[in-house]
C-alpha cells in the first residue's frame, strides 16, 4: 500500500474475510509479499521484498496471527523485486529465491531449518532488469528448478537445479516477452 504497510485478512472459511490486520509498517516500498512457513513451526509467516532498501525479510507468525518484527534475510538484493519461498536444496525447509532489478541477479538464500538464512548464492546475472522468480520441477527429476522474468531483455528463462541447490546456466524459454514482469506455472 502507499503507507508501506503489509496487511492480512483472516478467511472465515466460507469465502468471507475478517477485518484488516497489520503485519507491519516498514520504511521501504514492499514489492512482493507472500505467506510461507519459514521457521518450520507449522504456521504461515510473511515473506516480503522491498525495492527502496534492497531488503528481503520475513515476519514470524506466533501461531495466533500476530507477527513479530522484521527479520532480515539480506540487504544486498539490489532493488528487490520478488522473493519466493521454496525448498531448493532438498533438505525439507523453505529457502528463498530472489530477483534483483538493478544488478540483473537471480539468487537464493539457504534456510537452516529454523528461519535463519545463509549468504546470497547467485544463480545468474543474465536477467536484465529481473522482475520475478518462481520455482517448479520443470525437468521432472524431483527438485525445484528456478524460473525468472526480466523486463529489459523481454526474457522468460529457467535454471536447472542439480538437486542440492546448484544451478546450471540460463536456459531461455522466450526472449519475446515484451517487458516481462511475471512468470508462474500451473
Segment roles from a protein language model:
Residues 1, 46-50, 96-99, 146-149:
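Hydrophobic beta-strand segments that make up the repeating blades of beta-propeller
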Residues 12-13, 36-43, 62-63, 86-93, ...:
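Calcium-coordinating acidic loop motifs
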Residues 31-38, 81-88, 131-138, 181-186:
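Beta-propeller blade termini
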Amino acid at each position: 500500500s502507499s503507507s508501506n504497510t503489509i496487511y492480512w485478512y483472516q478467511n472465515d472459511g466460507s469465502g468471507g474475510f475478517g477485518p484488516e490486520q497489520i503485519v507491519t509498517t516498514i520504511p521501504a516500498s514492499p514489492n512482493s509479499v507472500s505467506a510461507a512457513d519459514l521457521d518450520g513451526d507449522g504456521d504461515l509467516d510473511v515473506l516480503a521484498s522491498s525495492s527502496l532498501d534492497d531488503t528481503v525479510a520475513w515476519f514470524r507468525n506466533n501461531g495466533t496471527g500476530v507477527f513479530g518484527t522484521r527479520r532480515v534475510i539480506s540487504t544486498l538484493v539490489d532493488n528487490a523485486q520478488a522473493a519466493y519461498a521454496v525448498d531448493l536444496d532438498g533438505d525439507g525447509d523453505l529457502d528463498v529465491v530472489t530477483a534483483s532489478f538493478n544488478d540483473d541477479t537471480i539468487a537464493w538464500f539457504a534456510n537452516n531449518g529454523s528461519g535463519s538464512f545463509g549468504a546470497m548464492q547467485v544463480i545468474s546475472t543474465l536477467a536484465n532488469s529481473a522482475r520475478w522468480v518462481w520455482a517448479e520441477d520443470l525437468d521432472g527429476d524431483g527438485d525445484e528448478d528456478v524460473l525468472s522474468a526480466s523486463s529489459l531483455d523481454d526474457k522468460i528463462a529457467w535454471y536447472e537445479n542439480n538437486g542440492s541447490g546448484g544451478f546450471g546456466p540460463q536456459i531461455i524459454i522466450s526472449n519475446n516477452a515484451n517487458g516481462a514482469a511475471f512468470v508462474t506455472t500451473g
